[in-house]
A protein has these predicted regions:
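Non-catalytic, charge-rich alpha-helical accessory subdomains
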Residues: 81, 85-86, 90-167
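Switch/coupling segment of Walker-type NTPase motor domains
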Residues: 2-95
Length: 167
């Protein structure tokens, strides 16, 4: 690093390289960008939604989310619940990417949609705000990518899966 002859991407699990070499590299004309997953206040911000260019990218993002949030147990693979969860996230992220204004294309919007996805045991006809959003989108564009994914999720999952995923 001290030779400063190239561009670098450095992993720094202990957080020492940035402290020890950061100022030197900045003085040498380098632009330092840090993604700190331990202390987000010391991190630049990363929005994966900014890198979505196609439906294939949505699927890659969903797969990355699933892989990085699954448990270590025997059932952490491609079982029914994981498949339903993938359809659900694909539908929500597809909706955000195609329909949301640029300032709402982020994980905050995704989490708000997940939190609004309430299911009620005693009322199978209940529609939460996300169901209503998808109904409106389907009325406007029945072949929309997000609508197709949400339809598959609802068909595969039903109320039972909704309750399990949202609890």
């Amino acid at each position: 690093l001290m030779q400063m002859h190239s561009s670098y991407v450095v992993t720094d699990p202990k957080g020492t390289v940035l402290v020890e070499c950061g100022k030197m590299l900045e003085k040498g004309g380098y632009v330092i960008k840090s993604l700190n997953t331990i202390n987000f206040r010391k991190s630049m911000h990363y929005n994966p939604f900014s890198y979505i260019r196609s439906e294939k990218d949505i699927l890659k993002l969903v797969n990355t989310i699933i892989v990085n949030t699954k448990g270590d147990g025997d059932k952490s693979g491609e079982d029914f619940w994981v498949k339903a969860e993938k359809l659900y996230y694909t539908a929500l992220i597809g909706y955000i990417w195609y329909e949301a204004p640029d300032h709402e294309k982020n994980f905050t919007t995704l989490l708000e949609m997940i939190n609004a996805s309430e299911a009620r045991e005693d009322d199978e006809t209940f529609k939460n705000p996300v169901d209503v959003m998808f109904d409106e989108l389907e009325a406007r564009d029945p072949d929309h990518f997000a609508v197709k994914q949400y339809r598959k999720y609802k068909l595969a999952a039903g109320v039972v899966c909704s309750k399990r995923l949202l609890n």
